[in-house]
Amino acid sequence: HKVYGPTGIGVLYGKEEWLDKLPPYQGGGEMIEHVSFEKTTFERPPLKFEAGTPDYVATHGLAIALDYVSALGMDNIFAHEQALTHYALQQLREIEGIHIYGHAANRGDAVISFNVDNIHPMDIGTLLDQLGIAVRTGHHCAQPLIETLGTLGTVRASFGLYNTKE
């Protein structure tokens, strides 16, 4: 869901008929067609969802990021991420006591969540960080899932075009 652009910017993509029905979540700027004490009428999408001054710097950064990934080719990025994910899964499965959560073959994502018996996920994250390997640890904004798994958290490795096997 990320395309290597700046933080704090995104795209709302949807069918026009649904966007027309969707209320704006903020107010201000050029999104207002007419306002009175009785009623506010909003512009049509996309203006309807653009409150305040747009972040022109982030918009430009997103455009450059999209040009970059387009030039590389999404198929090439996908193939690279899949190769890294496959390699990492092979390596992880060699670890005694490993528990890999929810990763089915050929699912298409480049994310692996795991734990190792008797080692706290944060400890694994700290050790990997000392080796120059960046991972996330914790509940990953999914506490109900983590509770269902019966664990305190997981280690999550995700792969992108900037990662290598090394």
Question: What do the predicted segments below correspond to?
Answer:
Residues 1-166:
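Pyridoxal 5′-phosphate
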